[in-house]
A protein has these predicted regions:
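Arg/Gly-rich low-complexity intrinsically disordered repeat tracts
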Residues: 52-54, 423-437
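Interfacial juxtamembrane loops and adjacent helix segments
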Residues: 142, 147-162, 271-289, 296-297, ...
Length: 437
């Protein structure tokens, strides 16, 4: 549970206050959890036998197999990369690499092993909501100039909300994940109690997250959100004839409104909307041009080492080897930070090769497979709950086209994948797990 508070940790005494504390805290919590988990297996024979059977059943689940394959190839790519040491340990600034990926995998397997009931997952989501709210409160205090809080100030030109994450782009996708948890809680725990104090607290957090999202002003996440809404509503319309017409109209309204805002993004009316930057979606924007250069460099790097890539954390070597002078303009300085390709597609292709990229994609294909295979389960998720899963995955993948994964996205991605493994157990696997539990 404590891992979901990782997002709140800010260590102002370090050179990278928004990053270092998070990965140190996460690793400590996961390591301690693993130690106590193993001690429990060692000293409780009856419980350990059940856990072994449970794990055996889990490793027959297609999604668990896919996640395991991705992590395995990620580590293998580092071992055979241009700098295995750096691929595994990363650096002080990023704190990623193989060591962090191993911790995320342990986290993934621990929650799958220990969270056997719906109430366990709901409690985890409550912790995630708490972390999201605290992240936002930190940003408010920092924005107001409170002593001891670092980050963007409200008075800064072109202010964008950074929270306790330090980067508006990751604030945006983070609140989309926390909104998924909030909506799931409303659809389950508070389905018939929407006026209760718990439900009202969730509605309040959703409103807070909406404001944060708006002031984070991140175009990739905005496009991801719109795509998620359209696809999720489309799925509901496809599976529910009764609501099909109303949902089709809703999708049409969303598309028209967004289209108008994008078409007239240069008007004074639109520019007065907080976070109006998100409506400026053009390929002429400097941020897009910078990324286009980095994607070309990443593609060339992939062609040089197509199987397992250059190794995690080694994009900087590709950037140096194939440096494009158009990236640096004396009048404007350099663009996006150049140790990443700023795209989940090009980052995984360049750093883990075609094998790593296919393993990454296989996680979502496997999710789609168990999603489909479990559709006839009488005790399975409702169509609305299924639409939430579709929405958050679509939002994550779309925004990831122009952004790379970091700790605050990885922890949510692995949480959602673990929860999907639990929620969409296909009949044969579900029977084994329930018997073993």
């Amino acid at each position: 549970m404590l891992t979901m508070l990782m997002v709140v940790i800010v260590m102002t005494s370090t050179l990278f206050p928004f990053i270092v504390g998070k990965y140190v805290f996460f690793r400590i919590v996961v390591d301690l959890a693993l130690i106590f988990f193993l001690l429990g297996l060692l000293f409780d024979d009856r419980h350990s036998s059940a856990i072994y059977r449970h794990l055996s059943a889990l490793y027959k689940n297609p999604l668990v197999i896919a996640v395991s394959a991705f992590v395995g190839i990620f580590l293998l790519a580092g071992f055979f990369g241009v700098d295995p040491h750096f691929s595994f340990w990363s650096n002080f600034e990023r704190g990623e690499g193989g060591i962090q990926m191993l911790h995320f995998y342990i986290f993934f397997m621990l929650i799958l092993s220990l969270f056997r009931e719906e109430k366990d997952w709901r409690e985890l989501f409550w912790w995630a909501l708490g972390g999201g709210v605290l992240m936002g409160i930190y940003g408010l205090l920092a924005g107001g100039g409170m002593q001891g809080f670092v980050g963007a100030r409200f008075s800064d030109p072109g202010f964008r909300f950074q929270g306790s994450i330090g980067n508006p782009a990751y604030v945006a996708i983070y609140v989309l994940f926390t909104s998924f948890y909030a909506l799931y809680l409303l659809a389950t725990e508070y389905k018939k109690k929407l006026t209760s104090s718990g439900a009202l607290a969730i509605f309040g957090s959703l409103a807070f997250f909406a404001v944060i999202f708006l002031f984070a002003a991140t175009r990739g996440a905005f496009i991801g959100l719109i795509a998620a809404v359209v696809v999720a509503l489309g799925y509901l319309g496809f599976t529910n004839k009764k609501w099909r017409k109303k949902l089709s109209i809703s999708v049409g309204i969303v598309v028209v409104i967004v289209g108008i805002l994008i078409a007239f993004q240069g008007s004074l009316v639109v520019q007065k909307i907080p976070g109006s930057r998100i409506f400026d979606i053009t390929t002429t924007a400097k941020t897009f041009q910078d990324r286009a250069i980095m994607w070309k460099i990443a593609w060339n790097g992939f062609l040089d080492r197509p199987a397992l890539g250059w190794g995690p954390e080694n994009y900087l070597n590709i950037f140096d080897a194939d440096f494009n002078t158009a990236y640096f303009k004396p009048a404007e300085g350099f663009g996006a930070w150049f140790d990443r390709a700023h795209s989940i597609v090009f980052d995984y292709l360049a750093e883990t090769g075609i094998l790593g990229f296919l393993a990454y994609i296989s996680m979502f294909i496997s999710l789609l497979y168990i999603f489909w295979k479990s559709r006839k389960r009488e005790d399975g998720p409702t169509q609305f709950q299924r639409s939430l899963f579709i929405g958050i995955i679509v939002a994550y993948l779309i925004q990831g086209l122009v952004l790379f994964d970091v700790s605050v996205t990885y922890i949510n991605l692995f949480t959602v994948l673990a929860f999907a493994t639990y929620k969409f157990q296909i009949p044969s696997t579900k029977k084994q797990i329930n018997t073993n539990g």
